[in-house]
Swiss-Prot record:
Residues reported to bind 1-deoxy-D-xylulose 5-phosphate: 167, 193-194, 215-216
Organism, as annotated: Azotobacter vinelandii (strain DJ / ATCC BAA-1303)
Any GO CC annotation of this UniProt entry: cytoplasm
Keywords, alphabetical: Cytoplasm, Schiff base, Thiamine biosynthesis, Transferase
Gene name tied to this protein: thiG
SUPFAM superfamilies on file: ThiG-like
Molecular-function annotations in GO: thiazole synthase activity
Active site: 106 (schiff-base intermediate with dxp)
CDD domains assigned to the protein according to its UniProt record, in alphabetical order: ThiG
Protein name: Thiazole synthase
GO terms (BP aspect): thiamine diphosphate biosynthetic process
Reactions accelerated catalytically: [ThiS sulfur-carrier protein]-C-terminal-Gly-aminoethanethioate + 2-iminoacetate + 1-deoxy-D-xylulose 5-phosphate = [ThiS sulfur-carrier protein]-C-terminal Gly-Gly + 2-[(2R,5Z)-2-carboxy-4-methylthiazol-5(2H)-ylidene]ethyl phosphate + 2 H2O + H(+)
Amino acid sequence: MSPARNDKPFTLAGRTYASRLLVGTGKYKDLEETRQAIEASGAEIVTVAVRRTNIGQNPGEPNLLDVINPARYTILPNTAGCYTAEEAVRTCRLARELLDGHKLVKLEVLADQKTLFPNVIETLKAAEVLVKDGFDVMVYTSDDPIIARQLAEMGCIAVMPLAGLIGTGLGICNPYNLRIILEEATVPVLVDAGVGTASDATIAMELGCEAVLMNSAIAHAQDPVLMARAMKHAIEAGRLAWLAGRMPKKLYASASSPLEGLIR
């Protein structure tokens, strides 16, 4: 029997990936733990906060690229720590210089330090500039379906609505908005932020997300490497469940076995 839905490759900027789990590089105790967790996750795309992580801009300091080989992983520079469109654009251009013309970036422009909620006005400004400048923009945004639509129409190659606030581990706080975004999507939709454990990642994939990006859920686990393995399997399970199509929810019970031929 064929699945309820047809699977399709996970493709970004013309490149296809086997793993639908994207991982961050912050908050680990050291670079070796970072390397082990990323390897255990099976991820092929690794995101890096350019303003906080040395990828060559600080000679003489430990370089993340010494343990995360760009020949093996797609490096996804992000603009974490930026609070204006101008800061974000400048950071992306720096990343392009450091990574020899690399065009794939993750845009995030934050509103304040307490919530780390996206500033959608500044995000829209930055996205417009970056797209015109030739970047392939994956964009962190709120779970507002209208903003997600506008970002896609602007030319962003993927929209990444938050599931919960960054670093909170609250899980999928508003699955209904995510469903609307997914139903209207013309570009890949990835959950970004809020995942706390494997079941959260599975739920995101069961909703129909193309992939999930996470950092804190792995790095803050008591055993980050083991959690990375759990997330790998959670993503795969959620995707398979979405393809299979879940049974409908019912108010009343329905017997698993037919009444015909019942022994009396």
